[in-house]
Amino acid sequence: MMGLYTNKRILVVGAGKSGRAAAAFLIKRGAKVVLTDKKMSLPVDEELKKLAEEGVELVLGGYPLVKDWELLVVSPGVPLTEEPIAYSLKEGIPVLGEIELAYKELKAPIIAVTGTNGKTTTTSWIGEVLKIAGFKTLIAGNIGYPLIEAVEEEWDAVSLEVSSFQLETIKSFKPKVAVLLNLTPDHLDRHKTLEGYLEAKARIFINQDRTDVTVLNYDDPRIRSLGRKTPGRVFYFSQKEELEEGVFVKKGKIVVRSLGVEEEIIDIENLPLPGPHNLENALATVAACWSFGVSGKNIERGLRNFQGVAHRLEKVAEINGVLYVNDSKGTNPDSTIKALNSYERPIVLIAGGRNKGNSFGELAREIREKVRFTILVGECREELKEALEMVGYDKYVVAESFEDAVKKAKELARPGDVVLLSPAAASWDMFKNYEERGELFKRLVLNMVEG
């Protein structure tokens, strides 16, 4: 039987997790697949070897010279200005992301989550609630598990994290519930302006209709304004306002008000994760799951049950009265500010990496108020140093390497302190991704225990 992709010449750009998953999916369906990545070179790892054995042609260290593809599939980390993508867009060759490719095959309803910060925690929290409510749930997307890997299986629901990069290449993607958490400057190296970034995020609801729901953060003016643009039904959440319709905080409890009826869900004291940003994530989770049809009782059980996610304010160990916390997923200044506001204890901060086009001014002011000592590391350490000096903060040292940064943090920390890895920058100057950075931090800390 001829399928949609049989004998079709398809170029997959980017040989990371989602690119590999897309190539594997397409080769199984009889496509002629070329997987290309200009940043990779030979020799290849076992997974790529296996793909090559299955018939995927690998072009690494550059792009194919013969431009004969009929469809291009782009990985989320690859800019649309890259040569083969720009060529395809100019020539009218279809360009899809891995999420769009998977969506065409998936039958399960999707709750999709986007925003600058809190995506991974909220996506995972929603997944936890749905599982407790009895739905066979897949948690996927920009969270380490490509959606395309899940299309062979039957699911009742999908909780999906989507980035602005992934939303750039959707065509028909239509989530049952779309969640927009917040918007602060990030990825301006790619989107150029905050408006361009907002526009990319707002693509999450472009294919919705009145049978779908758009969950928006009422406290973020830019996100709130999207309520006038979405074709879906709007359901707001707020930490600050008592809403006529939506999810909010009243007398220390999370409350849902819908169709004139009010229901208390949980006392905020009983939420398992610290910090005001996690209250925001919890409110978004309640709004999304309520919109999906989950009962208040099951939402409460799911909220309580959640253990948090790796690399996001993850407690690693307490050694000699010092708490070590891995927040490697804090890859922009706003995320690190939220991490700093999660603790009452004095903080020794490890920060630095590759800047994604952000200003460190506001973070520097927050560090001045909250941080006892800062260790600067990575490519943007000089930028951070300048920002700290501009606000009159001089309690910092510069580390020679990541290992040196952790060693210095240990030496500077006192009993009662938190040593917080929250870099406010990407990991690509020293690591493959933020996970690798976080894993090394955890290993170095746990070696202290054994040492």
From Swiss-Prot:
User: Where are its TM segments located?
Assistant: none
Q: Which residues bind ATP?
A: G115, T116, N117, G118, K119, T120, T121
UniProt keywords (A-Z) are: ATP-binding, Cell cycle, Cell division, Cell shape, Cell wall biogenesis/degradation, Cytoplasm, Ligase, Nucleotide-binding, Peptidoglycan synthesis
Q: Does the keyword Cytoplasm apply?
A: yes
Q: Which GO terms describe its cellular component?
A: cytoplasm
Identify the EC number(s). Answer: 6.3.2.9
Q: Which reaction(s) does the protein catalyse, per the Swiss-Prot or TrEMBL entry? A: UDP-N-acetyl-alpha-D-muramoyl-L-alanine + D-glutamate + ATP = UDP-N-acetyl-alpha-D-muramoyl-L-alanyl-D-glutamate + ADP + phosphate + H(+)
Q: Does the keyword Translocase apply?
A: no
Record localization = Cytoplasm
Q: What is its main location?
A: cytoplasm
Q: Which Pfam families match?
A: Mur_ligase_C, Mur_ligase_M, MurD-like_N
Any single GO BP term: cell division
A single Gene Ontology MF term assigned here is: ATP binding
Question: Pathway, per UniProt?
Answer: Cell wall biogenesis; peptidoglycan biosynthesis
Under NCBIfam families, the record lists: murD
Instruction: Describe the family membership recorded for this protein in Swiss-Prot or TrEMBL.
Output: Belongs to the MurCDEF family.
Q: Please describe what this protein does.
A: Cell wall formation. Catalyzes the addition of glutamate to the nucleotide precursor UDP-N-acetylmuramoyl-L-alanine (UMA).
Q: List the protein's name.
A: UDP-N-acetylmuramoylalanine--D-glutamate ligase
